[in-house]
Amino acid sequence: MKNKECCKCYNPCEKICVNYSTTDVAFERPNPCKPIPCKPTPIPCDPCHNTKDNLTGDIVIIGAGAAGSLLAHYLARFSNMKIILLEAGHSHFNDPVVTDPMGFFGKYNPPNENISMSQNPSYSWQGAQEPNTGAYGNRPIIAHGMGFGGSTMINRLNLVVGGRTVFDNDWPVGWKYDDVKNYFRRVLVDINPVRDNTKASITSVALDALRIIAEQQIASGEPVDFLLNKATGNVPNVEKTTPDAVPLNLNDYEGVNSVVAFSSFYMGVNQLSDGNYIRKYAGNTYLNRNYVDENGRGIGKFSGLRVVSDAVVDRIIFKGNRAVGVNYIDREGIMHYVKVNKEVVVTSGAFYTPTILQRSGIGDFTYLSSIGVKNLVYNNPLVGTGLKNHYSPVTITRVHGEPSEVSRFLSNMAANPTNMGFKGLAELGFHRLDPNKPANANTVTYRKYQLMMTAGVGIPAEQQYLSGLSPSSNNLFTLIADDIRFAPEGYIKIGTPNIPRDVPKIFFNTFVTYTPTSAPADQQWPIAQKTLAPLISALLGYDIIYQTLMSMNQTARDSGFQVSLEMVYPLNDLIYKLHNGLATYGANWWHYFVPTLVGDDTPAGREFADTLSKLSYYPRVGAHLDSHQGCSCSIGRTVDSNLKVIGTQNVRVADLSAAAFPPGGNTWATASMIGARAVDLILGFPYLRDLPVNDVPILNVN
């Protein structure tokens, strides 16, 4: 096409001609009908598409993930509007890899294709991060679900609300915990997650150990430590292990249990009448055959809903700052146009929501212009910035003892549908020696670590080899101190203006070292403290696990087990030196990450600095970024408190990318909460906030 202002695209099926602007999409087809004179226009108009397949919606939702599936369901139920939901993937409702809880672990995979859904492009976008200099240049793939349910379709379905504190302290007005708790309750009753009631000796031993540590921390008088919960006072918030004990609820309605230890997580799994289990996730909760037929058309009172699968969204079409349509590409590579009457809601996740906005002309004008985006709508360099995630430093522990005793101690650790591999363990606060704990941590209990226990060796294969740890060993288990207030921020940028299937550029640098300058030491320490925050957190997480294991050695013996526990990854000797160094150097222990600046040339000082240096290797190679990405289009930066994209009339973002701060644990409950809140914001009435808890979607397993 030569005319840069306005061209004609001729539809070969209908023999009609429609305006088409090359300032929007570079796309053309043969012209079987006569050219019609065209007056130049600066306004983008409909691209070439098959008019037989044209759709028009009042609300067009982009992405059927945790938020988008819920949003489409309830908008269709509580309004007479025409709702169109576009999803790049499939439904997978009859795919046992998705629906069977054990399918997650490869039950149905061919032996030579034993990959998880998160590693399989049939189920997820394979978003490789740009080289991470803080992790030796690694480029990890961070899973992003592609199909009905989004990432809820491919993950372990650990449902965690996150506690009151993160919302009351890190989220803006209108999004405090009391504002959102009913929406969390809505998600919980809709999913109806299960808890594993299988007793595991190791879990009971660990809970008894954590209770002892909590009692010691309370007695110490320290204002902050990892098992202190201000909301429960001088009572350890640790589940008891007596036969009549009541399980503690990490997802309590009032959000009191920001710090709590428990025997089992909540898993998005339901038991069927025949005794079998099915994974319960956003897709089969809100879009099942009770509500949407096999052709994607809504049923009964959901007849206003249309779900289009295999629809990769290219961009939103604007007239001025008002969205008038959405372009998507079907599985055959044909471009389609959906007309928008009221508004567009983007629910494509933390990676793809900002990329759709950027391709649509919302973002940093300087950068977007440089890569060829022509139709610039609103200049906001913050779109795609502020990306946050959780990070999981992993430890491996060996159980020593007679084989029969080790087997007895580790019994009931196997993955099953109700635990999905996790055997508890705790939501923890800040370590007392973390220099980066919030200023009000003396009065408010923050959730900092999610402690999880699972069987086997949970580190990458190359680390197993280098450490001499065999995955077939039957005397090893994994403890993970997931850093759920991980300090680094990343950002996302599109690489091209017109290839929606391209993975965007994902920049996230994890563990940065601090290089001293010539400035006085007292001026450098505040900068070093923030720069080293990720490493500080990781090593303190190791110390928390070490303290737990040392206490477990005692409680295991008290429970009649003739075993002993030794951390083997990281090496026990290094963790022992770290623990002793924390006691020796106190609040300034972390200064020894920068030995030239601390100026301690004593043998003990040099050894501790060397210990920190060696331990820094482990979180860089034996840990991973979770698939908990969010905050890349957050409230106050890209969207306002009503989730409307700043600078537009009628576009919202209603997924985890809009989060003001990462939730305290696994993220899909928070993504769903945002979608639920968006229903009421769009409809202008608290339908979901006030919906009775017994009014829930009905599961259809056919």
UniProtKB/Swiss-Prot annotation:
The chain crosses the membrane at residues 55-75. GO terms for molecular function: flavin adenine dinucleotide binding; identical protein binding; oxidoreductase activity, acting on CH-OH group of donors. One of its GO terms (cellular component) is membrane. It is found in: Virion; Host membrane. It comes from the Viruses. It is a single-pass membrane protein. The active site is at H628. The keyword Phosphoprotein does not apply. Its main location: virion. InterPro entries: FAD/NAD-bd_sf, GMC_OxRdtase, GMC_OxRdtase_N, GMC_OxRtase_C. Its EC number is 1.-.-.-. Belongs to the GMC oxidoreductase family. This is Putative GMC-type oxidoreductase R135. The lineage of its organism: Viruses, Varidnaviria, Bamfordvirae, Nucleocytoviricota, Megaviricetes.
